UniProtKB/Swiss-Prot annotation:
Signal sequence segment: none
Disulfide partners: none
Binding residues for NAD(+): A201, H202, S231
Known role: NAD(+) hydrolase (NADase) that catalyzes cleavage of NAD(+) into ADP-D-ribose (ADPR) and nicotinamide.
Gene: tcpA
Single GO BP term: signal transduction
Active site: E267
Domain annotation TIR: ranges: 192-324
UniProt name for this protein: NAD(+) hydrolase TcpA
High-level lineage: Archaea, Methanobacteriati, Methanobacteriota, Theionarchaea
Pfam family, one: TIR_2
Length: 329
């Protein structure tokens, strides 16, 4: 069993986004991080599974795909799943599953969340809990630690209370338990609901944009992408305008199809309007086009440094991450 467990605010945020967005459906995913000083640090998550209102499981195929996504030095260090409206507890299936995990990795962690409890003023301990297993019984892990602070003190999980945006913040200092769980805030700009808005033509989804959105999401970014964000019955124009306003940057996937479409160009106009206010927000990606073709559409965009899909999707993802991390320092 790990002596301590730390989890980044980014990983918590990913879990909340994944589980709250699923509504009544149970979801599951993997915890990604690395061992540290006899314990485990959870840096981010990889959402893997959508189940039903009664059941969810992570398949061997999903685990294999997740392993292929790992960066150098990263490991799968645990799993999480949601119980919407049911409270936080380990079922007998959870116990048996986690015992199998512990057989090959004694540091493996399990996190259970009831996203329906993530309401304003509610203690985080009421809806998020870590578990391990001992003697065929679940053992809840208590105690939270705030890192990156000169005050290396322990915090009772009940003192992390949900704010009006649905994320936990620490309010009152107390002393808490044995196994330590750290709570560390992301350096991404919290004033925006999304880190990036993806502006694209529908025809580019299948072979490029969908995978780009999924990879950015797996890296911990809050992504406004229509297939992630829009629901049946949503007002398309209003939802897009709302997404543009609440996004820190706009990724514009420029392609031949993009230049032919009206909606993507309206989205681009919205991003250009934000830049008129003195904010650099447009991150251009060239997909299957030349500089001359971009020039014929917009000389301003042609003179922007852009990432090209010809160099591979991982290159594009890394270039976007590099810009965002540079701006968040």
């Amino acid at each position: 069993m790990a002596k301590s467990v730390s989890i980044s605010y980014l990983a918590l945020e990913q879990i909340f986004n994944d589980t709250i967005g699923a509504g009544e459906i149970k979801v599951a995913g993997l915890l990604v991080g690395h061992p540290v000083n006899g314990g485990v640090h959870i840096a981010r998550t990889i959402p893997t599974s959508r189940g039903t209102v009664t059941y969810v499981r992570i398949s061997a195929e999903e685990i294999s795909r997740a392993v292929e996504e790992l960066n150098p030095g990263e490991k799968i260090v645990g799993w999480y799943h949601s119980r919407p409206g049911q409270g936080v507890f380990f079922s007998q299936d959870d116990i048996e599953t986690h015992e199998k995990c512990l057989d090959f990795n004694p540091y493996f962690q399990a996190l259970v969340i009831d996203p329906h409890q993530a309401k304003y003023g509610t203690p985080m301990a009421d809806c998020v809990r870590f578990y391990t297993v001992r003697n065929h019984k679940e053992v809840p892990i208590h105690g939270y630690k705030l890192t990156g602070s000169s005050m290396q003190s322990y915090y009772d999980p009940k003192e992390f209370v949900f704010d009006k945006y649905g994320f936990p913040h620490h309010y009152t200092l107390t002393h808490a338990g044995k196994t330590k769980i750290s709570h560390r805030k992301s350096n991404m700009d919290a004033s925006f609901e999304y880190d990036v808005f993806i502006c694209h033509a529908h025809e580019d989804k299948e072979f490029f944009v969908r995978e780009l959105a999924e990879k950015l999401h797996s890296k911990g970014l809050r992504v406004w992408y229509d297939e992630f964000t829009l629901s049946l019955g949503d007002n398309l124009r209003r939802s897009i305008e709302n997404g543009l306003a609440k996004s820190r940057y706009g990724i514009v996937v420029l392609s031949k199809r993009f230049f032919e479409k009206e909606w993507p160009q309206k989205e681009l106009d919205g991003l250009v309007a934000k830049e008129v206010e003195g904010k650099k927000v447009i991150l251009p990606v060239w997909h299957g086009i030349t500089r001359e073709e971009v020039q014929s559409f917009s000389s301003i965009l042609a003179n922007r440094l852009a990432a090209s899909s010809e160099k591979g999707i991982d290159y594009v993802v890394n270039e976007i991450l590099r810009v965002l991390r540079k701006k968040s320092v």
